[in-house]
Amino acid sequence: MLTILSEKKTLSPWAKGGIGLSAGALLLVLVGLLFPTAAAFFPLVSLWCSCVLFYGALWVLHTAGVELDFFHRAAIIAFWAGAVLYFYWALDRRQFIYAWDYVNYIQKQFNTEAAFALGPVAGFKYIISTFSEDYTNFITLFTEFPFCLTAKTGDSYAFAQVFCVLPSLMLMLAGLTIKIGQMLEVKNKFWYFLIGFSWVLTYPFLRMSAMLAQPDWFGLIFAFAILLLTLDYRFEKLEPGRFMLIFLATAAIILSRRWYLYFVVGYYFSYAL
C-alpha cells in the first residue's frame, strides 16, 4: 500500500496553473451567461487575462531554457517593490494635464467599460472591432484590473500598469538578461544579473510612456518573448510548443499596437539572414 502511494504521480506546477486558469475561464463563462451586465465581469476578465499573461511569460522562460533561482526571484520582487514606490512618488509629486495623445488609452478604457456594461458579447465585439486601428483596445483587457479599483484618473491609469503590465515585463527582462549571459558564458553570474537587470529595468525610455499613461511597454513583453524564444534557436529540430509561443507572441505584439509590425518584420528578416 505504501509503495502504491509513493508511486502516485502528482501534478506539476504547470499543470496546476493550467487547471486553475481553465477553471477561471469556466467561471467567467458562467458569470457571463448568468449575469451578463454585472459590473464585476470585465474586471474579472482583466484579472484572468493578466494571470494568463504571467503564466505565459513563465512558460516562455521554461521553453527558452531559463531557470529563475531564489536569487533571481528575490531580485525581481525587490525591484518590483522599488518600482511601486517610485511610480507612487513620481506621480504624486507632479502635475500633468492628460490631453491629446496622453488621454487616448484612458478614453479607450472608458469606452470598453461602457461596451462591457451592455454584456460580454458587446464588449468583446467592440474590442475586436478595433484590431485594424493603429491604437487597438487589446491592452484594455489587461489594464481594467486594478484600474477599476482606483479613482480612474490619468495618474491612476499610469500607476495601475505597475500591477498588470510590469510583473510580466520584468520576467521577460530578467529572462533576457539571463539568456544573453548564457550565450556569452558569463562567469560572475551574480553581479552580471544584478547590474544587467537593473540597467535594462531603469532604462528611461522603458518607463517614459508609462508615466504618461501610454502603455506602449505592454508590447515589449511580447517582443522580448520573441527574442527569448529565437536568440539561440536555429530550428534544427521541431518544437511545437516553442512554435506556438512564437506565433502567439507575434500575434499579440501586432494586436498591442500596429507600429510594432516594424519590429516584427525587421527582426524576422534579420533572423532569416
Give short role names for the model-derived ranges.
Residues 104-112, 120-152, 159-163:
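Short hydrophobic/aromatic helix or loop-helix immediately within or flanking a transmembrane segment
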